[in-house]
Amino acid sequence: MTTETLACTYAALMLSDAGLPTSAENIAAAVKAAGVSVRPTMPIIFARFLEKKSVEALMAAAATQAPTATSAAAAPAAGEASGKAEEKKKEEPEEEGDDDMGFGLFD
């Protein structure tokens, strides 16, 4: 993501949070106040996109589609538990196999 895109995104989020309209003029003013220079078309593109969908609707959609931390953490934990059980099963036959090899280094 470019600096221009991030600046316009943060400006739109800030304007929405403040309850101000996300017009091209407001986005351009917020970006200019932040000291970031963007192409003149960037605020227009963002404003036209946000005419069709509000920032709140986009944030709500992102929140419902994002995986939760608990489900993401639970899946690897379950995989690790079964993986550890499999490792223990695999280790036991190897230990028995070492005794039967008959190397006898310390006998």
UniProtKB/Swiss-Prot annotation:
Keywords: Ribonucleoprotein, Ribosomal protein
Region (Disordered): 67-107
Biased composition (Low complexity): 67-82
Pfam family, one: Ribosomal_60s
GO cellular component: cytosolic large ribosomal subunit
InterPro entries in UniProt: P1/P2_N_sf, Ribosomal_P1/P2
Biased amino acid composition, Basic and acidic residues: 83-92
Example GO biological process: translational elongation
One function term, GO molecular function aspect: protein kinase activator activity
UniProt key word Ribosomal protein: yes
Its job: Plays an important role in the elongation step of protein synthesis.
Family: Belongs to the eukaryotic ribosomal protein P1/P2 family.
Assembly and oligomerization: P1 and P2 exist as dimers at the large ribosomal subunit.
UniProt cross-references to HAMAP family, sorted A to Z: Ribosomal_L12_arch
Name under which the protein is recorded: Large ribosomal subunit protein P1
Organism phylogeny: Eukaryota, Discoba, Euglenozoa, Kinetoplastea, Metakinetoplastina
